[in-house]
Each structure stands twice: as structure tokens, then as C-alpha cells.
Amino acid sequence: MDQQMSYFLPPITNTLPTGNCTLREVYRWITEDKSLETVTNELRAFIREGRVAEYRQLKQRQLPFVTPHGVFSRRKSDALISASGLVVVDIDHLASLEEAEQLRDHLFEDPYLGTRLAFVSPGGLGVKLFIPGDETVRWAMSYIQLLYCLLYTSPSPRDGATSR
């Protein structure tokens, strides 16, 4: 869990990193940061209430983000300083928070994926996985779709500087 990546303070329009962090630090933020928990609960309430536009605005204005692919001098693919060896798999449009939590747990334990970090997305209806690989790790999306019968697996972005 010592892979390095860039982190950015909100809003999402920031292109210059605030600093670098490890995967372990990202895990701690997700599991222990009370202010992030408060924002996440508010985001999930917006989703439950069908207030999608407000959800997007709050998410873009309030949540910090990282570039799991590595350390960047700015948020652009040609600004990669060092690769982390990680890519992101996004699974979206799940039916409920409970389904997302169950899928997160299954995928984290899957021996073939080698998942380093799995968490329920801020809206509560998706899962994000940080797995070993590079931009060519399309096999992971196919594997998850076949094994877990998912229809909504978003491929890892072509641009490694894409935020998560």
C-alpha cells in the first residue's frame, strides 16, 4: 500500500497537485476522515432524493481527489513523473448501497484481481477498485463482467491523469 500518487484539493478544476500520498493514506482518508464522511453522507442523500445536479456540484466542489496512476506535476497525461503501477476500475449504476458494499467486498477478496483498494463511490451506487496494471488492463473489466454478471463497468480512463 505504499504506491505513490498525486492528490488534489477541491474543486475538481484544480490541475496542480497539492502533494503526493500513498495508497495507505487514501485508505485512511476514506475510512477515518470525519469531514469527508459528512460530505459523503450529504452526497448519498442527494442521490436518494434524485437531486443529481446538486450531487455533481457538491462532489466537484467539496471532494479531494487523487490520480491513482501515479505522481504528476499537473493533471495531464504527459505530466507523469512516476507511475504507481495501479489502474482504476469503476463499476457504476448499481441498485443500492447494500449491493455496492457486497460487490466491493467480493471484488476485494477476488484472488485474480489483486485489488489494492476497493471502496463504494461517493454516491453509494458504484464501486471503485485500484488494481495492479497499466492502461492496457482491459482484461480486468471483462473478467468482472463475466464473473459478476455486471453490465456497467467503465473502462479505466485512457488518460492516466484522470482523477478519481
Predicted stretch roles:
Residues 161-162:
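Ala/Thr-enriched low-complexity intrinsically disordered regions
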Residues 1-125, 132-148:
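Signature for HUH/AEP ssDNA processing cores
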Residues 152-157:
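Conserved small/polar residues in nucleotide/adenosyl-binding loops
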